[in-house]
Amino acid sequence: MTQIPTIKQVRAFTLKGGGADYHDQSDGHWIDDHIATPMAKYPEYRQSRRSFGINVLGTLVVEIEDSAGRVGFAVTTGGEPAAYIVEKHLARFLEGARVTDIERIWDQMYLSTLYYGRKGIVINTISGVDLALWDLLGKVRGEPVHQLLGGAVRDELQFYATGARPDLAQKMGFIGGKMPLHHGPAEGEEGLRRNLQELATMRERVGPDFWLMLDCWMSLDVNYATRLAQGAQAHGLKWIEEALPPDDYWGYAALRKNVPTGMLVTTGEHEATRWGFRQLLEMGCCDIIQPDVGWCGGITELLKISALADAHQALVIPHGSSVYSYHFVATRHNSPFAEFLMMAPKADEVVPMFHPQLLGEPVPVNGRMRLSALDRPGFGVELNPECALHRPYTH
């Protein structure tokens, strides 16, 4: 019987400048434009998301080294606070354990942090550790993560694009384009009119058949979201995304009943764990859930979330996440397409989503990605050695 390697050391680093913390961009990037946010009710924080601190945490890099010297790693958001949690709390549950003990390790990390965790940065941190474990296991076995998850159910992934220019995404071969909502309730009737005019203009550019979606980033209330959805029906809006704060399950249930027939309600980017998604699904809050594998609990938890969604006949279209979601989507029948974040400053070209932090990160070609692009062991990417890592804590 082959001896299973054990985990020798866990290390946590911080990294600034784009990558997993994709809001950490230079001036002029579309992602930091005048975009509706919960903070847009305050005029001084309306023009830029960085103005209220969306980029303060930075990227967390987790490395896990096994007894044979192999290293699995993953990136997510969380920065220095998350690095502290890894080094000072979570590392004890990994070091000395077998690299295959992923389920037990996840359970211990989650239960041991319940009194200060459950959601937010703690679950981000657990997600990063979990993803690094899956990367390591893939390297130990010489297999890509999608094979560890039971194997692919499709030979090719298809993508919609999130960015400021769905019309350009259409020309690049994507199946749809999701654009940020620019004006929230605090900007009144004129803001609502401008939102609908921007959607109408984009519909004119892309024609009647290309998917158009609106990303509202938690910024609306039920009344405004209902009026927006009703006004957007004339312009063929496919879905309205994350219209309400993530804890307003009751509002989502009401909104789903209010939107025009055929329009989808989606959310879940900022939800976490099977329990949070159980609430969304059992209350009938949405048609599509959008967990971020780097924020919801990692691959281990996303498998449970996906099974719950499947039982409720809901699609699972993970938020962003690059290779971490690609390997998952390839293996799930209820994830028929994936999201690609257009991280070029003007959303006018396809660039790796977590650039410059990862090397070997695949990108869609004509809106699609062959499974062969995901055939390397683990998640198939490496850290860029030119990106300076900082280890703020040790244990």
UniProtKB/Swiss-Prot annotation:
The record marks 339 as: Transition state stabilizer. Belongs to the mandelate racemase/muconate lactonizing enzyme family. RhamD subfamily. Its EC number is 4.2.1.90. Keywords: Lyase, Magnesium, Metal-binding. Reaction proceeds via a syn dehydration. GO terms for molecular function: L-rhamnonate dehydratase activity; magnesium ion binding. The active site is at residue 319. This is L-rhamnonate dehydratase. Catalyzes the dehydration of L-rhamnonate to 2-keto-3-deoxy-L-rhamnonate (KDR). It catalyses: L-rhamnonate = 2-dehydro-3-deoxy-L-rhamnonate + H2O.
